[in-house]
């Protein structure tokens, strides 16, 4: 059959297929490296480089198997023997419908399944072309079942693996010995699965024809060799690296404590007073410790029964003009000791501190229902108010702690400063001099917005004896120690590469499956499609996926790596390994499972095991709803394009 008249459709199909691959890369590749970026083991740029390599390799070696299911397993192509041009138009429609919906979802940062898109689009054009008889409904039922099986299976495998790791490694007082013993096993399992997948699916591409037992034997042998290499070289190197890191952190901690102790001894007798400060000025604002006045504090604490007073501050601000100390130099404070053992400082109302703290410290007014104290943090142990003020102006984060029990003023939220989330550049600043304070004020004035807010600020900085509520069992969240982070750092990178490889093999079919069908129909002049999937078409799809990742991938990486649940290297390793294992198995048996479903199932399962409240269930609900919405929406887009193309092809045929 002469197909030259439909060359325009093939050209259009290639263009749309690249756009579809672009959308797959922008949306689905986040499943592979999202957790690695979220746990901090790789940067976004490093993730893009690694994903580009492994996505392309996986698409070439594994993509042919699933591509056959996409292009021949969902619809009965034999019904189009007499109307080949209709099937070609349908393949173009399927790509358009899938690409449009995935681009919209990527723009909205909504992670959806590329498999859902292409399946729904294929069904949509078939219903328009020849009605419901063109759809192989039993195949569709199997695919729909896999949408539920894949997250459950992946989540179950991830959960079991994480429980074992937590039991034998994470909960140990010294996790290093058990972790080092398990490293060869972890690496061997990852390599074995990967090698088996390549040889089983990619053997025709490599020119090999081996029985399955031979492939399994080779995979097992390669895994043993790799495990021996890890045990012989990687484990001793990792042990030295962990010991060096711990020794360095211990030395830094000792030096920091010694430095703070010396400064505290030198500055504790009193506070400096700046020129222009008038303690008797009625415009001054008291700055005081509320450690003994907070709700829940004992009477003994208020009476000063502790051997040393806890230094904190409470800043009560009222509406009024504020001027920078750079312009008028009217910043001052003076310490006053009351008989309750607390130190009271006075801050001039017209000083720059008023304005700067007003704009730099944000009060969470939505926490009135929970006045109890959060975890204790110590910002600094020093009595130097310059240090506190400069740190606050530079943007120390604030967490709500308790409400002041001051009956003379309206109840307002109180907060404490937390110093564990400040950028490295901010930590390097000096906070203990007047010049550093003035520099911070000058920078803050440039960034500050005009306006005023009434607030009361309190921060507890130094009292380790203050009672605090332990988090409930549901609120507890396990965090990796420094040595555990190092143990699983490289493992998560390896499993992320493995997941990217599996993703390339599974999801390249979503973009290239219809294009392969379109190309084979045009080349052979029929719908039989007996030829194997061309490798260069798989490579073409891999390039499109990588392009989408570099341009738009970071939008969904944020959702998968950070928003759904916090990720650590240990939990990220289990998520990556179990979900990738599920995807590779599905790819090898030709079942187009969704990598999104596998990864979401693993993330939710491990996050729920780590902490009952660590999972963003609202986001999970939205993703779950999107799984159902994608198929009909993509089908509607495809059906509309199919109707348009059939109209155009009808005009074209009549004109000939």
Curated annotation (Swiss-Prot):
Stated family: Belongs to the inorganic phosphate transporter (PiT) (TC 2.A.20) family.
Extracellular side: 1-5, 68-86, 131-142, 212-213, 505-531, 588-594, 644-655
Membrane topology label: Multi-pass membrane protein
Species in which this protein is naturally found: Mus musculus
Gene name as annotated: Slc20a2
Protein name from the UniProt record: Sodium-dependent phosphate transporter 2
Function: Sodium-phosphate symporter which preferentially transports the monovalent form of phosphate with a stoichiometry of two sodium ions per phosphate ion. Plays a critical role in the determination of bone quality and strength by providing phosphate for bone mineralization. Required to maintain normal cerebrospinal fluid phosphate levels. Mediates phosphate-induced calcification of vascular smooth muscle cells (VCMCs) and can functionally compensate for loss of SLC20A1 in VCMCs.
Tissue distribution: Brain. In the brain, expressed in the choroid plexus, ependyma and arteriolar smooth muscle cells (at protein level). Widely expressed including intestine, kidney, heart, liver, testis and skin. Expressed throughout the vertcal crypt-axial axis of intestinal epithelium.
Lineage: Eukaryota, Metazoa, Chordata, Craniata, Vertebrata
Phenotype caused by lack of the gene: Mice develop basal ganglia calcification and display significantly elevated phosphate in cerebral spinal fluid, calcified optic nerve tissue, moderate to severe hydrocephalus, poor skeletal development, low body weight and significantly decreased postweaning survival rates. Juvenile mice exhibit abnormal endochondral and intramembranous ossification, decreased mineral accrual, and short stature. Adults exhibit only small reductions in bone mass and mineralization but a profound impairment of bone strength.
């Amino acid at each position: 059959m002469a197909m030259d008249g439909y060359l325009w459709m093939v050209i259009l199909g290639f263009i749309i297929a690249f756009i579809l691959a672009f959308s797959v890369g922008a949306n689905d590749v986040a499943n592979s490296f999202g957790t690695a970026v979220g746990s901090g083991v790789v940067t976004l740029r490093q993730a893009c480089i690694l994903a580009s390599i492994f996505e392309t390799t996986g698409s070439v070696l594994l993509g042919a198997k699933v591509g056959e299911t996409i292009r021949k397993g969902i619809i009965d192509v034999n019904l189009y023997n007499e109307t080949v041009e209709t099937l070609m138009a349908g393949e173009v429609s399927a790509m358009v419908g899938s690409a449009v919906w995935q681009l919209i979802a990527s723009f909205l940062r909504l992670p959806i399944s590329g498999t859902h898109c292409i399946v729904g689009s294929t069904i949509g054009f078939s219903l328009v072309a020849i009605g419901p008889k063109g759809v192989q409904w039993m195949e569709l039922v199997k695919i729909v079942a896999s949408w539920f099986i894949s997250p459950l299976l992946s989540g179950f495998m991830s959960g079991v693996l994480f429980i074992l790791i937590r039991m034998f490694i994470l909960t140990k007082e010294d996790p290093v010995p058990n972790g080092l013993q398990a490293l060869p096993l972890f690496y061997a399992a990852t390599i074995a699965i990967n090698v088996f997948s390549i040889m089983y699916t990619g053997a025709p591409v490599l020119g090999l024809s081996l029985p399955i037992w031979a492939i399994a034997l080779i995979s097992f042998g390669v895994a043993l060799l790799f495990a021996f290499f890890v045990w012989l070289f990687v484990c001793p190197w990792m042990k030295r690296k962990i010991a060096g890191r711990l020794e360095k952190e211990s030395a830094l901690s000792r030096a920091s404590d010694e430095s703070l102790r010396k400064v505290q001894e030198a500055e504790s007798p009193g506070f400096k007073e700046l020129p222009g400060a008038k303690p008797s000025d009625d415009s001054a604002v008291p700055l005081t410790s509320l450690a003994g006045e907070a709700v829940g504090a004992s009477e003994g604490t208020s009476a000063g029964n502790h051997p040393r007073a806890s230094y904190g501050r409470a800043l009560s601000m009222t509406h009024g003009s504020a001027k920078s100390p750079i312009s008028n130099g009217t910043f001052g404070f003076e310490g006053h000791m009351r008989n309750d053992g607390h130190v009271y400082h006075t801050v001039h109302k017209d000083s720059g501190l008023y304005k700067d703290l007003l704009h730099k410290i944000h009060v969470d007014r939505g926490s009135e229902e929970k006045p109890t104290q959060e975890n204790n943090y110590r910002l600094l142990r020093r009595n130097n108010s310059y240090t506190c003020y400069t740190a606050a102006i530079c943007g120390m984060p604030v967490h709500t702690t308790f409400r002041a029990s001051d009956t003379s003023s309206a109840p307002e939220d109180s907060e404490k400063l937390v110093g564990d989330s400040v950028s490295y550049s901010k930590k390097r600043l000096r906070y203990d001099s007047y010049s550093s304070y003035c520099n911070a004020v000058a920078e803050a004035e440039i960034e500050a917005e005009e306006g005023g807010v009434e607030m009361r600020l309190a921060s507890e900085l130094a009292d380790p004896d203050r009672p605090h509520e332990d988090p409930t069992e549901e609120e507890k969240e396990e965090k990796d120690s420094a040595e555990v982070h190092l143990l699983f750092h490289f493992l998560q990178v390896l499993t992320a590469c493995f997941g990217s490889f599996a993703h390339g093999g599974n999801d390249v079919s979503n973009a290239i499956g219809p294009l392969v069908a379109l190309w084979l129909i045009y080349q052979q002049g029929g719908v039989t499609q007996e030829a194997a999937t061309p490798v260069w078409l798989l490579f073409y799809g891999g390039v499109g996926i990588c392009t989408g990742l570099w341009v738009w991938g970071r939008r969904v990486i944020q959702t998968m790596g950070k928003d759904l649940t916090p990720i650590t290297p240990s939990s990220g390793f289990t998520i990556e390994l179990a979900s990738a294992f599920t995807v590779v198995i599905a790819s090898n048996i030709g079942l187009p499972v969704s990598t999104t479903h596998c990864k979401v199932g693993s993330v939710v399962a491990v996050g729920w095991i780590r902490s009952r409240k660590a999972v963003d269930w609202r986001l999970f609900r939205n993703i779950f709803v999107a799984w159902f919405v994608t198929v009909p929406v993509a089908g509607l887009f495809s059906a509309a394009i199919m109707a348009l193309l059939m109209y155009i092809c009808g005009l074209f045929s009549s004109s000939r």
